[in-house]
């Protein structure tokens, strides 16, 4: 079982303890860590909606360290990011692979960042199917439709052409932070929080 650090805050009513993620949520920071799956996606979407309700004009920071995961779960987070009123900044710490890289790219323009030693990976969706030939054929058609949709999302957020995106995503394509900036997944490589605050000032 993973240990979650607790922090203690002094108030005029005494002490109050929070788990570290709840305390950071008060600062409008959300962590997207680990595999992207339905339960995790629901928690991230709920936090985004909560922070929108608290203040629809104040930005939200999404910190990403994820190997990717289920496409539909990732698209639930993506759609919520686009749906809510606050601008969502994204910051890759560690890695943003597969759906993680799409969510990194989906941050508000000029507010998409990565730390210098981050790794970003983009690729086409994959899936394994078994059953009758007709069912496999339907699954294949569906995954091709999903591939086109994901390509369109990368085109929208990176400024690359559809052909460039399709070619790059044909196989696992790994990038360091500088390469991710050149490709359009992020806007800036950050070495210090001061640079992030300068961008948003």
From Swiss-Prot:
<keyword id="KW-0963">Cytoplasm</keyword>
<keyword id="KW-0645">Protease</keyword>
<dbReference type="GO" id="GO:0006515">
    <property type="term" value="P:protein quality control for misfolded or incompletely synthesized proteins"/>
</dbReference>
<dbReference type="InterPro" id="IPR018215">
    <property type="entry name" value="ClpP_Ser_AS"/>
</dbReference>
<dbReference type="InterPro" id="IPR001907">
    <property type="entry name" value="ClpP"/>
</dbReference>
<comment type="similarity">
    <text>Belongs to the peptidase S14 family.</text>
</comment>
<comment type="subunit">
    <text>Fourteen ClpP subunits assemble into 2 heptameric rings which stack back to back to give a disk-like structure with a central cavity, resembling the structure of eukaryotic proteasomes.</text>
</comment>
<dbReference type="GO" id="GO:0005737">
    <property type="term" value="C:cytoplasm"/>
</dbReference>
<dbReference type="InterPro" id="IPR029045">
    <property type="entry name" value="ClpP/crotonase-like_dom_sf"/>
</dbReference>
<comment type="function">
    <text>Cleaves peptides in various proteins in a process that requires ATP hydrolysis. Has a chymotrypsin-like activity. Plays a major role in the degradation of misfolded proteins.</text>
</comment>
<dbReference type="GO" id="GO:0009368">
    <property type="term" value="C:endopeptidase Clp complex"/>
</dbReference>
<dbReference type="Pfam" id="PF00574">
    <property type="entry name" value="CLP_protease"/>
</dbReference>
<dbReference type="InterPro" id="IPR033135">
    <property type="entry name" value="ClpP_His_AS"/>
</dbReference>
<keyword id="KW-0378">Hydrolase</keyword>
<keyword id="KW-0720">Serine protease</keyword>
<dbReference type="GO" id="GO:0004252">
    <property type="term" value="F:serine-type endopeptidase activity"/>
</dbReference>
<dbReference type="GO" id="GO:0051117">
    <property type="term" value="F:ATPase binding"/>
</dbReference>
<dbReference type="GO" id="GO:0004176">
    <property type="term" value="F:ATP-dependent peptidase activity"/>
</dbReference>
<feature type="active site" description="Nucleophile">
    <location>
        <position position="98"/>
    </location>
</feature>
<feature type="active site">
    <location>
        <position position="123"/>
    </location>
</feature>
<protein>
    <recommendedName>
        <fullName>ATP-dependent Clp protease proteolytic subunit 2</fullName>
        <ecNumber>3.4.21.92</ecNumber>
    </recommendedName>
</protein>
<dbReference type="InterPro" id="IPR023562">
    <property type="entry name" value="ClpP/TepA"/>
</dbReference>
């Amino acid at each position: 079982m993973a240990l979650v650090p607790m922090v203690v805050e002094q108030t005029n009513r005494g002490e109050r303890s929070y788990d570290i993620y709840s305390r950071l949520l008060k600062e409008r920071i959300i962590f997207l860590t680990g595999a992207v799956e339905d339960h995790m996606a629901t928690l991230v979407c709920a936090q985004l909606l909560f922070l929108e309700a608290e203040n629809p004009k104040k930005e939200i920071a999404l910190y990403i360290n994820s190997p990717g995961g289920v496409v539909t779960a990732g698209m639930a987070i993506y759609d919520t990011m686009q749906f809510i009123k606050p601008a969502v900044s994204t910051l890759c710490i560690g890695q943003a692979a597969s759906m993680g890289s799409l969510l990194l790219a989906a941050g508000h323009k000029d507010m998409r960042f990565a730390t210098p030693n981050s790794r970003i990976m983009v690729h086409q969706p994959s899936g394994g199917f078994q059953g009758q030939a007709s069912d496999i054929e339907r699954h294949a058609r569906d995954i091709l439709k999903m591939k086109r949709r994901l390509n369109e999302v990368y085109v929208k957020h990176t400024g690359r052409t559809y052909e460039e995106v399709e070619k790059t995503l044909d196989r696992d394509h790994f990038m360091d932070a500088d390469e991710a900036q050149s490709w359009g997944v992020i806007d800036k490589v950050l070495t210090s929080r001061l640079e992030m605050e300068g961008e948003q000032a």
